[in-house]
């Protein structure tokens, strides 16, 4: 049962040659060469497994080798292997001794990789409770930070009190920085070298690069005392030399006092940007930063004016290497710059610092809690040429591909990571890589070595009798011949080593470049695409032309580079059918009589003809209508000469056959309207000579002649009726008008009013007239008195 399951496993591994690119390509003559072709390939070391000189057949997929008869025990198919060397369980709860804390599992393993095969490992990380914390406070002491210095004079006590709630083992240290003490970053007059603030006037310390002032200690009062004694300094340009200070604080492990089993926090406090990389070339400093500790006996950075500022890449390497987590506490104006830095530096966070550093305590506590809520893996070591991919399984339990970071974790939660490793090719060297959580001292060490050799290579029969009386060494089922011999069993000597007999013509490659010349005969290579054959391996069954991506259009067989078409197909690609069925139009005529059938498609020859069967042709004559003159002549009863009808039919390209006995397999049914409005029907067929013959001429549905008397009577009656109707209408209109006038008169008469006492026509007999010259007596008197 176990053997059957193992066989099934190999069958699953053995994929199709055409899909994977093939194994038996004829180029693998040894087991090791076979394994290098691809992870799908295996080697059969069984003796006498292949035909004479068919060494390439030993290299194939496991399934194909089993099918060829190779026993399972002789199949060389190494797979990737994982050996866990150290796997201590993760720590749970508080640990009395920090050296006993285990935060990653496993701790070391050996990985053997078959090139092209992936191997997945599971790594678990759990942050332990009450983990020791080392905090180094790195402060910018340029003149603009004077008020901040006064604010943090009691920071040590307050910070220790707050951190005691999170860990019982807390230490803190202090360092400061300003700028490289060299022009153009500082003024160089003697007065300003001694006191950079002399122009204010105010006393401040000479410009310095970095000073390590207080090693890490649990004495908070000592921290407060050191801070109270600090003095500010000054420089010219706005960017400071903070990255110099970060580098020294990270790499000077002994001087700073970083512990191996603790969380290393570096709090960087500044209100300005920092120089980095080649900025120091402004001062003529061109020696790159070496990333080493250069603190002198006074704990000052001694190479400040000699080495360049570190680059971002150098900072990342040293911070990760020394497990230092960086907390940028910067003012609002600088937050955007340092957020960009933090995106590049693993484990770095950014907090907004108030103008006087009044919120520094809360900023540090918040940053610490944020760092403890995240678990991120970092890869170190020799990873060149190694393919690594990560899948994170955080507290939700849902796998997240291409992610090596878990956020919103609680202390004590376990974060799992599936790490998939693969080698693209076989490199004859082992490599050492490290997977570690950012900021933690724990790490997983992995020794990666390639698995490119076969177990059968360990058993070698030197000068074996299996190789023609000792003419070679027997290994992995084949003979490795001594110089001057060749062949499957080293049976060919120097006299048969000539390849001229294996060449099709002088100057041509041996066996056409597709086979091996063994003892004067070609043994063709095996190909995943088909068979190679011929005395010179000059033929194959897969190099013919393709039609629509298919060899010989899938309608023929390829023989020595030429398509041999199956029945019903022709053409160079076997893409041309000999059937004319697709070319027959609905009327049963090939290409509607307007084209030729080529490869099952109509090629229209008549101008204007189109369509799959040339059925559309606006400019072509109607085959039915073109026979009109012939048909009408045949049906005419006016005594036209029969010879004249024959001539008209000849002009129309047709003859009339009155016999009813004709083939009705294919015909065209026509219908025309004649001059006398009759419907004429007839059939068109083609005789053996291809000429048109007219059959079954019928005339039907002829209209009857008109009845003239009835038409005249109807017209007369219609005229009479119209006259009567018009008279009636006139009479109605006149009557309506008269009635309207009478009504109007009656209305006016009813409105008239006459006086009843006097006849308006009567005149009296007496008339009275007035003399206009007569004046009354009194009026004359008045007029006279007025004049006087």
From Swiss-Prot:
Start and end residues of each PSI domain: 22-71
Gene3D superfamilies, per the entry: 4.10.1240.30, Cytochrome c1, transmembrane anchor, C-terminal, Laminin, ligand-binding face of the semaphorins, domain 2, ntegrin, alpha v. Chain A, domain 3, von Willebrand factor, type A domain
Residue numbers binding Mg(2+): 140, 142, 144, 240
Positions of Ca(2+) 1 binding: 144, 147-148, 271, 355
GO BP annotations listed: bone development; bronchiole development; cell adhesion mediated by integrin; cell migration; cell morphogenesis; cell-cell adhesion; cell-matrix adhesion; cellular response to ionizing radiation
Annotated ranges, domain VWFA: 131-371
Disulphide linkage map: 23-41, 31-454, 34-59, 44-70, 197-204, 252-293, 394-406, 426-452, 456-476, 467-479, 481-490, 492-519, 502-517, 511-522, 524-537, 539-560, 544-558, 552-563, 565-574, 576-599, 583-597, 591-602, 604-614, 617-620, 624-670, 630-649, 633-645, 678-702
InterPro entries in the cross-refs: EGF_extracell, I-EGF_1, Integrin_beta_N, Integrin_bsu, Integrin_bsu_cyt_dom, Integrin_bsu_tail, Integrin_bsu_tail_dom_sf, Integrin_bsu_VWA
Domain I-EGF: 456-491, 492-538, 539-575, 576-615
Transmembrane segments annotated in the record for this chain: 710-730
UniProt similarity note: Belongs to the integrin beta chain family.
Protein name (database record): Integrin beta-6
Biological source species: Bos taurus (Bovine)
